[in-house]
UniProtKB/Swiss-Prot annotation:
This is UvrABC system protein B. InterPro entries: Helicase/UvrB_N (IPR006935), Helicase_ATP-bd (IPR014001), Helicase_C-like (IPR001650), P-loop_NTPase (IPR027417), UVR_dom (IPR001943), UVR_dom_sf (IPR036876), UvrB (IPR004807), UvrB_inter (IPR041471). A motif (Beta-hairpin) lies at residues 92-115. Forms a heterotetramer with UvrA during the search for lesions. Interacts with UvrC in an incision complex. The keyword ATP-binding applies. Its main location: cytoplasm. GO terms for molecular function: ATP binding; ATP hydrolysis activity; DNA binding; excinuclease ABC activity. It comes from Pectobacterium atrosepticum (strain SCRI 1043 / ATCC BAA-672). PROSITE patterns: HELICASE_ATP_BIND_1, HELICASE_CTER, UVR. Residues 630-665 form the UVR domain.
């Protein structure tokens, strides 16, 4: 029987959470396809979803709008479900330049990519968990709608080994080569195997800390054991083990041969079309490139850019959707879309950009028309394939509300009793001087201020003006990378400065309890940055403070302002009524400042053996850029292997633990 979800938390549902959990569960059990959870900032939406997952015991996919929020969700879910499979599935590219052609300058840009091995391992681990068990939560980015290997072919390619089975050594080695594992008797690493007499050591592609030892005796599997690849220490013997392919795109030989025949037929047809239109250069280019790919596929079983032939390799017809992570999710799975007002439009936008680039490649003879089927899912395909869905947002868009039939589950009351900010509207004419006096009031009592402007120029001028008047102020803009952004937010919370000025400070997941004032300049200028949703999100940044307040500077109240003010007041009234009825006194949030830099670090909680020395030195690396972190990880891995070769296993294990902590930090900030 499959393992059940076990929720680990010191807290019990409170505020609006019990009612939200009950209604979401009832809706799912009644077969509702779409539900919306409208949860205000700081109301514990993730905890509510965790309770629903634990009670229903169904495999779940959680979609987040970006890698940073995905890492944050992954870390939270790891803490809630330490005994279950919580997996992470985001794009494994540190850098990606797709192939493209610019006709105006006759420039062809080759595909160039840098793959993050650790994230690739986590992706393989995610699909393995979905295929093997039911107690799975996969936290994914929009990468989940991009093409992946066909799950049926992936399952067919697996190598099952059981104790006592009859199989000779050569057959095992041949199968490992088909799974794209490489033999390496010197450097034993993920996705490789080594042979020593009748003993084969295999390092599974989806694992980062356990390897398999297969001991043969006269064409019979005598023993299967799991061991630590670093120390060689045997952890346990197992009666059976399944080895998964090294990549999601592995394909059986017979399917490759069939695909090659289909590609030849398409090439002949396409050449006729190009010649009929006097496109001789394009015909020559297409023939040369495709023939080269066919030769490589025949010799090696794959070629560079093999994903462009995915229609034939997965056996799908023209125009059919590609296999994606959704094909690995069981039919009764659950989909949770976090920050749905941002994530849903992202899903809709991916297909069009990809299509425009590929059409140019096809038109100018760089690719066959079938390459157009190597694409992300269309929005309609996503809708058709998505299982029962819960949309989670503080500001759901019309799409979610329409899909849920207007039946929105409110989670307005916070367990802490905190109220939504008080809102004031003040004239634009004196906004800068008025803001300066408000900042001084807040700075005097060690509180922080967020200021949002409409343009970059205004943000720069305001920052300069405030600095001239002796205020400690910093400016946040789009050129700042994720790590530096996290550093600035951390410094604001620590009190290194008092005021943060920016243009788009409504960023979801910006969690700063020290901020007691949000000032929105030119709030009466209708547009994207001053829409109802943007205003509510920005006002919500002051909702984690006991004295939270939002000042909207405008000479008139626009429709968006009126809606945002009315919605905030509705929430505040409901919160006050609940607090009065239950005798709750609002409490401020004391969130550890280090937390914001440790997204996903809990991922490694409970792994490995012995004392974790890694947590101590990790602080030294908190402010490193992703590139510097990657170099540090490589340096530590090199030292670790040196210690292992010198049989200094204690030192090697300590470095291994430190590398794992740094990898988790790298995921969080990349």
């Amino acid at each position: 029987m499959s393992k059940a979800f076990t929720l680990n938390s010191d807290f019990k549902p409170a505020g609006d959470q019990p009612e939200a959990i009950r209604r979401l569960k009832e809706g799912l059990e009644d077969g509702l396809a779409h539900q919306t959870l409208l949860g205000v900032t700081g109301s514990g939406k993730t905890f509510t979803i965790a309770n629903v997952i634990a009670d229903l015991n169904r495999p779940t996919m959680m979609l987040a709008p970006n890698k940073t929020l995905a890492a944050q969700l992954y870390g939270e879910m790891k803490e809630f479900f330490p005994e279950n499979a919580v997996e992470y599935f985001v794009s494994y590219y540190d850098y990606y330049q797709p192939e493209a052609y610019v006709p105006s300058s006759d420039t062809f840009i080759e595909k160039d990519a840098s793959v993050n091995e650790h994230i690739e391992q986590m992706r393989l681990s995610a699909t393995k968990a979905l295929l093997e068990r039911r107690d799975v939560i996969v936290v994914a980015s929009v990468s989940a709608i991009y093409g992946l290997g066909d799950p049926d072919l992936y399952l067919k390619m697996m190598l099952h080994l059981t104790q006592g089975m009859l199989i000779d050594q050569r057959a095992i080695l041949r199968r490992l080569a088909e799974l794209q594992y490489a033999r390496n008797d010197q450097a034993f690493q993920r996705g490789t195997f080594r042979v020593r007499g009748e003993v084969i050591d295999i390092f599974p592609a989806e694992s980062d800390e356990i390897a398999l030892r297969v001991e043969l005796f006269d064409e019979e599997v005598e023993r299967l054991s799991l061991f630590d690849p670093l120390t060689g220490h045997v952890l346990q013997t197992v009666p059976r083990y399944t080895i998964y392919p090294k990549t999601h795109y592995v394909t059986p030989r017979e399917r490759i041969l069939q695909a090659m025949e289909d590609i030849k037929v398409e090439l002949a047809d396409r050449k006729k079309v190009l010649l009929a239109n006097d496109k001789l250069v394009e015909e020559q280019r297409l023939s040369q490139r495709t023939q080269f790919d066919l030769e490589m596929m025949n010799e090696l079983g794959y070629c560079s850019g093999i994903e462009n032939y995915s229609r034939y390799l997965s056996g799908r017809g023209p125009g059919e959707p590609p296999p994606t992570l959704f094909d690995y999710l069981p039919a009764d799975g659950l989909l949770v879309i976090d920050e749905s007002h941002v994530t849903v439009p992202q899903i809709g936008g991916m297909y069009r950009g990809d299509r425009a680039r590929k059409e140019t490649l096809v038109e100018y003879g760089f690719r066959l028309p079938s390459a157009l089927d190597n694409r992300p899912m269309k929005f309609e395909e996503f809708e058709a394939l998505a299982p029962q869905t819960i949309y989670v947002s503080a500001t759901p868009s019309h799409y979610e509300l329409e899909k849920s039939g207007g039946d929105v589950i409110d989670q307005v009351v916070r367990p802490t009793g905190l109220l939504d900010p008080i809102i004031e509207v003040r004239p634009v004419g004196t906004q800068v001087d008025d803001l300066l006096s408000e900042i001084r009031l807040r700075a005097a009592i060690n509180e922080r201020v967020l200021v949002t402007t409409l343009t970059k120029r205004m943000a720069e001028d305001l920052t300069e003006y405030l600095q001239e008047h002796g205020e400690r102020v910093r400016y946040l803009h789009s050129d700042i990378d994720t790590v530096e952004r996290v550093e600035i937010i951390r410094d604001l919370r620590l009190g290194e400065f008092d005021v943060l000025v920016g243009i788009n400070l409504l960023r979801e997941g910006l969690d700063m309890p020290e901020v007691s004032l949000v000032a929105i300049l030119d709030a009466d200028k209708e547009g994207f940055l001053r829409s109802e949703r943007s205003l509510i999100q920005t006002i919500g940044r002051a909702a984690r403070n006991l004295r939270g307040k939002a000042i909207l500077y405008g000479d008139r109240i626009t429709a968006s302002m009126a809606k945002a003010i009315s919605e905030t007041e509705r929430r505040r009234e409901k919160q006050e009524a609940y607090n009065t009825e239950h005798g709750i006194v609002p409490q401020g949030i004391n969130k550890k400042i280090s937390d914001i830099l440790q997204l996903g670090q809990s991922a490694n909680k409970g792994k490995g053996r012995g004392n974790r020395k890694a947590a101590e030195p990790a602080a030294r690396y908190e402010l490193m850029t992703p590139k510097a972190l990657e170099l540090k990880i490589r340096e530590l891995e090199s030292k670790m292997l040196t210690h292992a070769q010198n049989l200094e296993f204690e030192e090697a294990a300590a470095l291994r633990d430190e590398v794992q902590v740094l990898r988790a930090q790298f995921i969080a900030i990349s």
